[in-house]
Amino acid sequence: MALSAAKKKEILSEFGLHETDTGSTEAQVALLTERIRQLTEHLREHKHDHHSRRGLMLLVGRRKRLLKYLAANNVDRYRNLIARLGLRR
C-alpha cells in the first residue's frame, strides 16, 4: 500500500513548506492521510485483512498525534491543514 513516487511528490509539492520538504508536520499528515485513504479503500474490498487493518489503525494514531502536536503549537496552521485535507467534517 505504499504511495508511488509521483504521488508523493505531488502531495509534498502541495503541502510541503518548500519543494524538498518531507519533515514538516503538514507534509507528514498529508502523506499519512493519503495512505489512510488507500488502505481504507483496500479494506472495503478485503474485509478480512486484519493485518492491514492493524496497520491502518497505527497510521490513524500517528496522524492523530501529529495533528494534536500541530494544534497545540500553531492553531492557524492546524485549521488550514484540516480544511485543505477535508478532515473533521
UniProtKB/Swiss-Prot annotation:
<keyword id="KW-0694">RNA-binding</keyword>
<keyword id="KW-0689">Ribosomal protein</keyword>
<comment type="function">
    <text>One of the primary rRNA binding proteins, it binds directly to 16S rRNA where it helps nucleate assembly of the platform of the 30S subunit by binding and bridging several RNA helices of the 16S rRNA.</text>
</comment>
<dbReference type="GO" id="GO:0006412">
    <property type="term" value="P:translation"/>
</dbReference>
<keyword id="KW-0699">rRNA-binding</keyword>
<comment type="similarity">
    <text>Belongs to the universal ribosomal protein uS15 family.</text>
</comment>
<dbReference type="GO" id="GO:0022627">
    <property type="term" value="C:cytosolic small ribosomal subunit"/>
</dbReference>
<keyword id="KW-0687">Ribonucleoprotein</keyword>
<dbReference type="InterPro" id="IPR009068">
    <property type="entry name" value="uS15_NS1_RNA-bd_sf"/>
</dbReference>
<dbReference type="InterPro" id="IPR005290">
    <property type="entry name" value="Ribosomal_uS15_bac-type"/>
</dbReference>
<comment type="function">
    <text>Forms an intersubunit bridge (bridge B4) with the 23S rRNA of the 50S subunit in the ribosome.</text>
</comment>
<dbReference type="GO" id="GO:0003735">
    <property type="term" value="F:structural constituent of ribosome"/>
</dbReference>
<protein>
    <recommendedName>
        <fullName>Small ribosomal subunit protein uS15</fullName>
    </recommendedName>
</protein>
<dbReference type="GO" id="GO:0019843">
    <property type="term" value="F:rRNA binding"/>
</dbReference>
<dbReference type="Pfam" id="PF00312">
    <property type="entry name" value="Ribosomal_S15"/>
</dbReference>
<dbReference type="InterPro" id="IPR000589">
    <property type="entry name" value="Ribosomal_uS15"/>
</dbReference>
<comment type="subunit">
    <text>Part of the 30S ribosomal subunit. Forms a bridge to the 50S subunit in the 70S ribosome, contacting the 23S rRNA.</text>
</comment>
